[in-house]
């Protein structure tokens, strides 16, 4: 019995000593080997996910959350197809429950109600590879789970009588501004590493009476182990969706025509590899919305698992 106890204690002590004294990376590499082999064998399928933290949520130049946000995401890629989901969750109640896109003449009852901004973005893409870059054709669904759906009630002449509101149920796929989902068709071109230019064309095709159009172009420079990105984007024609609108003197027309550079920015970003599959990204952005005459500087960090 004593011999057995001695053997048990000795074996346990030796085992614990090996665990403590052996470098962590040796165990990490051994653990990752099966995963690495699996990824190599199924190289056509990739799964990426992570979470970001930002001092502000800017989307195409628009300050939507008006607060720091958590931004989880997930991406699944199979051959040329890609499915991705993004969430945006404000850390405190800063956004009006009434949609930002409609400015009421008497907003007292609605702007008094504040919520933490939330948004769910779902993308389906198809990538077309070329020698000079990649074309990506996609459809995007924008859903705001906690904001009222605001829409216009018009008379027979087309004049607006009043604004109405309803709860944004996920199964509400109505159009004409009355649904809980806005669908966008987009086409993006991304150049090669030697010429990292990108061009974006996007148009709302469902649940946006204005069928808002957005154009964007940008370029990436390498600077001292950082990426320097410069871009500019804006709307073609007035659009409530991009908060670029003003009332017309004609009662049958709610929007005047016009164009606006709503998203001009410069960003510094850098990726730090903690492990081959674990990446930490840092970004500092300076963005100007010339229509709102607003300048915003934000800092964000994203933890990526790939």
Predicted regions and their residues:
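Outer-membrane beta-barrel "beta-signal"
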Residues: 30-32, 266-268, 293-306
């Amino acid at each position: 019995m004593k011999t057995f106890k001695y053997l048990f204690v000795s074996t346990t002590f030796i085992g614990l000593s090996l665990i403590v004294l052996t470098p962590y990376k040796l165990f990490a590499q051994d653990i990752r080997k099966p995963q690495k082999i699996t990824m190599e064998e199924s190289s056509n399928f990739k799964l990426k996910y992570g979470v970001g933290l930002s001092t502000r949520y800017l989307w195409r130049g628009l300050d939507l959350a008006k607060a720091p946000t958590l931004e989880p995401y997930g991406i699944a890629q199979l051959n040329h197809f890609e499915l991705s989901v993004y969430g945006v969750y404000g850390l405190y109640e800063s956004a009006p429950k009434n949609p930002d896109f409609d400015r009421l003449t008497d907003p007292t009852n609605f702007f008094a109600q504040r919520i933490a901004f939330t948004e769910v973005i779902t993308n389906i893409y198809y990538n077309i590879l070329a020698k000079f870059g990649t074309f990506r054709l996609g459809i995007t669904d924008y859903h705001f789970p906690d904001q009222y759906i605001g829409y216009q009630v018009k008379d027979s002449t087309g004049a607006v009588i009043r604004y109405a509101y309803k709860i944004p149920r996920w199964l509400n796929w109505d159009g004409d501004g009355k649904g809980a989902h806005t669908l966008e068709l987009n086409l993006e071109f991304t150049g090669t590493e030697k010429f990292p230019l990108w061009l974006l064309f996007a148009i709302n095709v469902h649940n946006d009476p204005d069928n808002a159009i957005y154009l964007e172009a940008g370029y990436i420079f390498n600077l001292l182990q950082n990426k320097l990105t410069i871009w500019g984007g804006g709307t073609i024609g007035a659009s409530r969706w991009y908060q670029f609108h003003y009332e017309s003197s004609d009662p049958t027309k709610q929007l005047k025509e016009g164009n606006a550079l709503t998203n001009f920015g410069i960003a510094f970003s850098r990726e730090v590899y903690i492990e081959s599959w674990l990446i930490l990204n840092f970004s500092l952005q300076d963005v100007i919305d010339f229509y709102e005459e607003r300048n915003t500087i934000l800092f964000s960090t994203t933890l990526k698992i790939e």
